[in-house]
Amino acid sequence: MLGLSKILRMGEGRAVKRLAKIADQVMDLDEEYTKLTDEELQAKTDELKKRVQEDGESLDDILLEAFATAREASWRVLGQKHYKVQIMGGAGLHFGYVSEMKTGEGKTLTCVLPAYLNALSGKGVHVVTVNDYLAKRDAEWMGRVHRFLGLSTDVILSGKNPAERREAYNADITYGTNNEFGFDYLRDNMAHSLNDLVQRGHNYAIVDEVDSILIDEARTPLIISGPVEGSSKWFSAFAAIAPKLTRDIHYEVDERKKTVGVKEEGVEFVEDQLGIENLYAPEHSQLVSYLNNSIKAKELFTRDKDYIVRNGEVVIVDEFTGRILDGRRYNEGIHQAIEAKEHVEIKNENQTLATVTLQNYFRLYDKLAGMTGTAETEAAELKSTYKLDVAAIPTNKENKRKDNVDLIYKTQEAKFEAVAEDIAERVEIGQPVLVGTTSVERSEYLSRLLQRRGIKHNVLNAKYHEKEAEIVAQAGRLGAVTVATNMAGRGTDIVLGGNPDIIADINLRERGLDPVETPEEYEEAWDDEIEKVRKESKEEAEKVREVGGLYVLGTERHESRRIDNQLRGRSARQGDPGETRFYLSMRDDLMVRFVGQTMEAMMTRLNIPDDEAIDSKMVTNAIKGAQSQVESANFEMRKNVLKYDEVMNEQRKVIYGERRQILEGEDVEKQIRSMLKDTIEAYVDGATAEGYVEDWDLDTLWNALDSLYGPTFTHEELVEGDEYGRPGELSSSQLLDALLEDANREYDELEEKVSEVAGEEQMRGMERAALLNVVDQKWREHLYEMDYLKEGIGLRAMAQRDPLVEYQREGGDMFNRMKDGIKEETVRQLFLVRNQLKQAGQVHVEDPAAGNEGVAVDRATQTTMGG
């Protein structure tokens, strides 16, 4: 198996052939592994671990045996054996590919193979999913196979405490969402003790729905933030003004770029409302952002589409999946403006404490791989951003899906009436229907139409996400109608006749059995239950095939072709029949922005009635062109986010690297002494730049030194004394030597006194705590300043300067100043302890391992996401 990693450098076609060869070799071992007893199969884990961890073999060397072991275990535990294409997909994941596998090809089972193989190294495997439910389900479901083979699995869920998280990360295989992994990374880099750390490195990640996580969510950075006081009154004031402003008279809106611009008439109106003379005067300058945000909240953010109001809180809805994004908040004041608009409690505006983009988080991993059903449209971005190649894995059976042409109506009302009519006809013959909508609002509108017609149906949107898996599991049954926002329910197969695995699991849980809490009883009951449900499902599936399989009906085109393809891909899995169609109207968002007015005018000229559809290649091509435009614009936006974050990323790596060294270092005294030297050197260089003693700025120097540690002599005593030759002939190097000797002597005295009171170990702990506090404080201030710099950097383009180059240059200067500030402030904080000792004759020294009050406040702050 040596040399298999060369596969990464081959063209996709050649790579897929090599993956097929590996799959054949794994399947050739089937007879040998089938004969093994359970004990012999389970013993393979320790044997393979030893060969990798002790004998020096590579994971490539043991791939065939590890895959054959996990494949046979899957059959014995789940009753499912990997097809050839699933083994190919698993091998692709091991080699760091994005394995593109169509919907229904069994990506979850595929993941078992590379997760098992890579876990044998003992360095940990992270399996990343899009939501908590899927993470928990996969950890339980696929965890049954891994646990059978003697590996530990665990899951990171939003409610878990640090101890539970640490335990989960110490498992061989850890499941969780991208948010949980990313936020734990940020929290680890705010920790003040090694005991507070939860993650144990970034060895290998398998990202499920890789396009959703690495592309759709990549524009939104992960942000841990803390509240800033005293701004809610202005959000309320402008929320009251915004409805009085008229679009195109007081302000303009660019729907494509999602920006607003206030016109002169709008400025005058606002000045009159607030009773001020000049909105742009320095003392009122911050009010401009409140005004812009109130207009954005009014025009660009729609309730039940972009967000919902739940329990008095504004909760964001993912524009791509329709799922609610608990814990995330829009940044830059947008979230507060929406809260003011909806008359709910306005939570304090937040200051960034730690942040990272998903692009840069996932690039921390030594090896990264992913799975998706639709990667071809994003292959270039996956390659350029993450260095990930796409391997298109063939389907297990031929695809029999029939994709009908789009039907286009003049109005949304006519479109939805036609949709309801089509659904009624399908229900009549018992064909299951999955309807995709783009917002909560539209899914509920269609639901009301279906209720009026007496059509039974399930609604799957952000408001009802708890029952997601159960609803999707039943969506392929005879006569089932499921209305879902976008790709809600992704990750759960729609199986004709019902998903037997999910239905059996639900049945067992209703009987009080659980694969984690009561594993033995669950496994004992599983075989009989799954056999019964599979028999029922199989019989019903035949009837569903006879009426045409699953009918997928899209009610609007999405900005991204990939999201449309994902919806279509829910139909005709594993060689089943299936059918799809999109219903559109000239008032749909995408049509309004790109083709609507021209086509609507043409339909009016041709006297086409509202309730009559057209199927026009011209419109279809215009939609494809519009989608390509939007995809390109979004790609550029993500690239732009990444370019700016690259600057922050380099700085973040330096700061987080230094923090980790401080936490892990036995002794930071040398570092403190070095900081003392660097700070005094910088002071002396600044004061003696003129060269001659009489031109030196010694008053300013001594003021700075007094603030830092308090020299034991005056500059007059030093210059006029004869220690360094004749009076007045002091050199700058002699001045520096004298000050360093004095400062180090004072620091020695501090050490002695603290050691007397609390022991030398406490002195080292105090140094570490002081250094960490200052690093965190200065880093927070730096993040704020970098945010401020980025907000205004676009204006540099007006001066014919490249904003990115200016951001890099100024950001670099600010970072260097911050590092100097860390040195200076750390030394100052420690000498303050000496001053307290001198005044009080004793000092109370906190044990840094027990925590730090300031840090505790930070950790308790709200975790949010900017957008």
From Swiss-Prot:
Record keyword Signal present: no
UniProt keyword Membrane present: yes
InterPro entries on file: Helicase_ATP-bd, P-loop_NTPase, SecA, SecA_CS, SecA_DEAD, SecA_motor_DEAD, SecA_preprotein_X-link_dom, SecA_SF2_C
Catalytic activity: ATP + H2O + cellular proteinSide 1 = ADP + phosphate + cellular proteinSide 2
Key words of the record: ATP-binding, Cell membrane, Cytoplasm, Membrane, Nucleotide-binding, Protein transport, Translocase, Translocation, Transport
Subcellular location(s) per record: Cell membrane; Cytoplasm
Source domain of life: Bacteria
GO molecular function, one term: protein-exporting ATPase activity
EC number: 7.4.2.8
Positions bound to ATP: Q86, G104, E105, G106, K107, T108, D493
Signal peptide: none
GO biological process: intracellular protein transmembrane transport; protein import; protein targeting; protein transport by the Sec complex
Xref: CDD domains: DEXDc_SecA, SF2_C_secA
Cellular component GO terms, alphabetical: cell envelope Sec protein transport complex; cytosol; plasma membrane
Record membrane topology: Peripheral membrane protein
Family affiliation: Belongs to the SecA family.
Role, per record: Part of the Sec protein translocase complex. Interacts with the SecYEG preprotein conducting channel. Has a central role in coupling the hydrolysis of ATP to the transfer of proteins into and across the cell membrane, serving as an ATP-driven molecular motor driving the stepwise translocation of polypeptide chains across the membrane.
Oligomeric and partner information: Monomer and homodimer. Part of the essential Sec protein translocation apparatus which comprises SecA, SecYEG and auxiliary proteins SecDF. Other proteins may also be involved.
Name this protein carries in UniProt: Protein translocase subunit SecA 1
Gene name linked to the record: secA1
